[in-house]
Every structure is written in C-alpha cells, then in structure tokens.
Amino acid sequence: MRKQRAGLPPDARADPEHYRSRASHETYRELGERARDELARTGGAIVDATFRRREDRDAFTAAVGQGARSPVFIECRAPRDVLRERARRRESDPRSVSDATVDLVDRQLDEWDSLDEVDAARHATVRADRDPPDIVDDIEAFLDQRTASGVLRFG
C-alpha cells in the first residue's frame, strides 16, 4: 500500500520517509477504508501491517467502523535478534521486495505502542518465531473461539 500510494512499483524500495508519522496515518486510514469495502463485499478481510502506533490503529479502526465487524488484532511477536536476522536476509536478497532493514526493525520496535486500547476479545498475541503452521493453528484457535462465543461474525 505504501509503495502504491507513493507511485512506486511493488519491487522498488520505499524511502524511509514513507514510514514517518503523517504518511503512516494516511496509509492506515486508507487500509481501513479498503478493509471496510472488502468486508462489505465478501464478509472478511485480512490486513498485514505493523499497527505499531496507537494513532495508526485508531485511524484504521475509525475507517473500518465499529460493531461486530470491528478489527481483530493478531500481534505477532518475536525476539529482536530474530527480527533483525530476518531483515538482514531480506536486505541481502536482491529478489526481496521488503523495505525492512535492521535499522527500520530497531526503530519500529523502539516506537512500539502496546495495544492497551484494544479489547482483549479482539486481540491475540502469538509467537512468530515458530514454524508457520503452528502460528496459523494458534490464530485459527483464537478466531474459532471468538466466533463460537459470538464476539466475531463472518459472512
């Protein structure tokens, strides 16, 4: 989304300025609008973003709207050294389209705002330093539990 908003091709590296506060606010607002439209069209949407600042989450949530279709936040956590190593691998891979650098990872972790404002029924934390199938299993279990309890509705 950031690259699209900046008029960059998907395989270009975005300038760090595209990750600053004002640009992020607008990006998250637009992500929320797109998620809202997708929810109306298909009944579901998955948005992959850091949501590291409360103001970004607020912009996204305001654009999506409230009610049974309010956002659910899945917080994927991993140790700093794991995230830094992943960024190093992406930086050295000429085929990578990721903007992640070790400096960006460090800055984002240092600027992290906890999700205190998010209702526990709409927030799960999963360890992201495991095999992907295990992570997916945890996310599915969380969503299944919330759907069964009526917190979430799909379709």
Question: Which ranges hold each PLM region?
Answer:
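Short, hinge-like loop/turn segments at secondary-structure boundaries
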Residues: 8-14, 64, 90-93
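Conserved substrate/cofactor phosphate-moiety recognition/catalytic segment
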Residues: 1-43
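Conserved nucleotide-binding/hydrolysis micro-motifs of P-loop NTPases
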Residues: 1, 51-52, 77-83, 130-132
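Hydrophobic helix-cap positions at the C-terminus of alpha-helices
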Residues: 38, 63-67, 115, 146
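Small-molecule kinase domains that catalyze NTP-dependent phosphoryl transfer to phosphate-bearing small molecules
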Residues: 92-155
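Short, electropositive alpha-helical surface patch
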Residues: 53-68
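Conserved phosphate-donor/acceptor-positioning beta-strand/loop module used by diverse small-molecule
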Residues: 67-88, 126
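Loop/turn-to-beta-strand initiation segments
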Residues: 41-45, 70-72
